[in-house]
């Protein structure tokens, strides 16, 4: 997930603060509607027409729904419908451009040309009575007469179907009517022919989603600055992120009266970024998550979660209170139209933690997790007496740290980092230690499933050496580990001599290798030429060609197969003596790599304090003396890459967080 700037807070923060200061009298009743009518200014008559319309009709449920929308409307802003001209320009680009770099350049150019014509209006001052009445009537028709929302109570209806927009800043257009027949799949036939599917919102959502499954976007973060809300345009995008697919899919689902919400986590607790997905409210009134355009289930299976929020029409009360007070809200939580649904997804605990005993601590308290590079706030908390803070519904198996947002718009630590374990126990991690120990580190990141799933192809492998290019008199001088997963390592003291070296698989299966680096007996790195066997596993895939095995990039790899089928060779130009071979298997590039610069730091309570910086050598290890024991450490690569996870090193054991 990327944090999308164009709908944070739904409009520029300075305008929010100016507006909501006027709304400090908001409570929870008809006074809210009166305040909204005052803020509507010259558009007040349009809103009063809506209220009068339902009073005359004596439809008091629709009147109550209208009051709900009007009560929170001062917070809402929308792109004007003129944005459709921008969408048309994007469509023109998509018709002729699909290559990634050309696509990015064209999208940037079109947006820059259109940006000056894009306008964001206040809903309360621009919405028409006809539009609002039409949207309310259509939503009620879906609820009262439709097939997939009859089980909703009024509050659920207000959250899932009633709103005239699905996401902040969405233009006030005819999305509900326009999209009703788009991607319907077989929902009507299934409902008609099978009793089990009658009124089944989950089945309907899955069916509609399956009909969109061909619209697969390749991932790129390039689109995060572009306000594309029109589903017909989004479905054509060759590249995008999870938010683009969600923006399109939620409109398509709700246009058919299917109660679908947009849920998100602001930050994975053990990865970079966060994530957006959808959930459907089933007949049992429980939400079922799913990924737009993806027919596979298990969207969050085995995922650790710190916080999950659901997008709503009305703003979150606590975030709104902080905005009204002029408090700084961290960028990760600036989408204020949400409610906390963490407990729907995982076991969650209310946790009271101690804060530092010195220094000024404000009431603007948050809880943060680490995003590979820095601490990211994922929820707000309540400052308590006795230098403590209370945080609600925190997911387990997560490293947290309490922070405050200052007037300088920065987040700073106000307490010890702590780990909330699988049983709900809190363990504080010290920020200093009298105990010291020497450390030896080979990686800066734990091994996750996306690497391990290839384990069958990243084991084994052998090196043969010969004086002849046809390897007719070759001998095996190195065998790589096959009984354990070793992503990188060194084979030393090989004492092998020859001009040609062949890398091949240990058996008939595949063996993927990213880099092989050879050293002579003086420890000097050798630079052999490449001998290709003439074939490759996937010749059209640039990441596993033979040339990838000596391109000095641990993120590309060569795929060997069979003992004499697909292999790669090296020509040293003359007979040499090889004393060591460093190897890097197909992986995530997070093992130490020769020539790259790395730094090791420890968390001192307020910042990462540098311990040492080195340039990695053929040992592939970061050795540091007298490192504080039991504190949080962070190993980062200064040459390339962004992935680093905090860890504790104790007695040679590493605990990753």
Regions found by a protein language model. Give the residues of each.
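A short, amphipathic beta-strand motif
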Residues: 349-359, 444
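Short amphipathic beta-strand segments in non-cytosolic proteins
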Residues: 364-382, 463-468, 472-478, 602
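Bacterial Sec-dependent N-terminal signal peptides
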Residues: 1-33
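Aromatic, loop-rich ligand-recognition surfaces of beta-strand-rich domains
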Residues: 435-475, 482-657
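Structured interaction patches on ligand/partner-binding surfaces of diverse proteins
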Residues: 406-434, 518, 647-657
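Secondary-structure boundary elements
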Residues: 38, 49, 58-237, 273
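Hydrophobic/aromatic-rich core segments of domains that either
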Residues: 33-41, 53-56, 192-211, 221-331
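Short Pro-Gly-centered beta-turn/loop motif in secreted/extracellular proteins
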Residues: 386-408, 495, 626-629
């Amino acid at each position: 997930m990327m944090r999308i700037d164009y709908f944070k807070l739904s409009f520029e923060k300075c305008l929010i603060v100016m507006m909501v200061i006027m709304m400090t009298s908001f409570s929870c009743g008809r006074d809210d509607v009166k305040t909204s009518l005052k803020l509507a200014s010259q558009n007040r008559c349009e809103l009063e027409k809506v209220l009068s319309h339902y009073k005359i009709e004596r439809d008091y449920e629709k009147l109550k729904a209208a009051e709900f929308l009007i009560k929170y409307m001062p917070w809402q802003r929308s792109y004007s419908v003129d944005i459709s001209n921008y969408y048309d320009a994007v469509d023109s680009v998509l018709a002729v451009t699909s290559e990634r770099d050309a696509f990015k350049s064209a999208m940037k150019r079109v947006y820059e040309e259109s940006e000056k014509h894009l306008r964001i209006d206040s809903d309360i001052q621009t919405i028409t009575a006809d539009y609002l009445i039409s949207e309310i009537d259509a939503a009620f028709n879906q609820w009262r007469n439709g097939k997939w929302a009859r089980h909703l109570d009024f509050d659920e209806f207000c959250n899932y179907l009633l709103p005239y927009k699905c996401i902040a800043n969405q233009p006030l257009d005819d999305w509900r009517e326009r999209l009703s027949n788009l991607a319907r799949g077989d929902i009507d036939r299934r409902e008609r022919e099978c009793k089990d599917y009658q009124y089944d919102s989950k089945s309907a959502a899955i069916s509609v989603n399956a009909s969109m499954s061909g619209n697969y976007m390749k991932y790129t973060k390039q689109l995060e600055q572009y306000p594309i809300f029109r589903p017909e345009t989004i479905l054509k995008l060759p590249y995008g992120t999870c938010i683009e697919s969600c923006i399109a899919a939620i409109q398509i689902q709700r246009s058919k009266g299917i109660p679908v919400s947009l849920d998100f986590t602001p930050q994975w607790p053990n990865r970079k970024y966060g994530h957006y997905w959808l959930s459907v409210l089933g007949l049992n009134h429980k939400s079922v998550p799913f990924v737009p355009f993806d027919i596979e289930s298990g969207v969050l299976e085995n995922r650790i979660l710190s916080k999950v929020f659901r997008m709503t029409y009305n703003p979150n009360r606590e975030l709104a209170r902080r905005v009204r007070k002029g408090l700084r809200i961290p960028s990760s939580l600036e989408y204020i139209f949400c409610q906390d649904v963490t407990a729907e997804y995982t076991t969650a605990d209310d946790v009271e933690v101690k804060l530092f005993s010195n220094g000024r601590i404000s009431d603007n308290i948050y809880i943060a997790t680490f995003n590979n590079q820095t601490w990211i706030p994922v929820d707000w908390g309540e400052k308590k007496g006795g230098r403590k803070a209370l945080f609600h519904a925190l997911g387990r198996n997560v490293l947290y740290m309490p922070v405050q947002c200052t007037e300088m718009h920065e987040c700073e630590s106000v307490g010890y980092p702590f780990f909330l374990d699988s049983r709900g126990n809190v363990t504080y991690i010290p920020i200093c230690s009298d105990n010291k120990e020497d450390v030896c580190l080979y990686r800066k990141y734990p091994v996750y499933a996306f690497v391990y799933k290839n384990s069958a192809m990243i084991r084994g492998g052998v090196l043969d050496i010969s004086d002849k290019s046809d390897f007719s008199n070759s001998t095996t001088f190195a065998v790589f580990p096959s009984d354990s997963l070793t992503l990188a390592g060194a084979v030393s003291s090989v004492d092998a001599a020859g001009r040609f070296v062949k890398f091949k698989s240990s058996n008939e299966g595949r063996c993927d290798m990213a880099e092989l680096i050879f050293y002579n007996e003086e420890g000097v790195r050798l630079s052999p030429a490449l001998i290709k066997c003439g074939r490759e596993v996937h010749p059209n895939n640039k990441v596993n060609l033979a040339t990838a095995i000596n391109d000095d990039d641990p993120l590309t790899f060569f795929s060997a197969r069979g003992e004499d089928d697909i292999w790669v060779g090296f020509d040293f130009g003359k007979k040499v003596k090889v004393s060591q071979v460093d190897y890097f298997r197909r992986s995530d590039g997070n093992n130490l790599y020769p020539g790259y610069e790395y730094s090791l730091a420890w968390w001192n309570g307020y910042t990462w304090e540098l311990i040492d910086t080195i340039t990695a050598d053929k040992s592939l290890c970061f050795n540091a003396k007298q490192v504080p024991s039991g504190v949080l450490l962070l190993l980062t690569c200064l040459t390339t890459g962004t992935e680093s996870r905090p860890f504790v090193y104790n007695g040679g054991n590493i605990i990753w967080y």
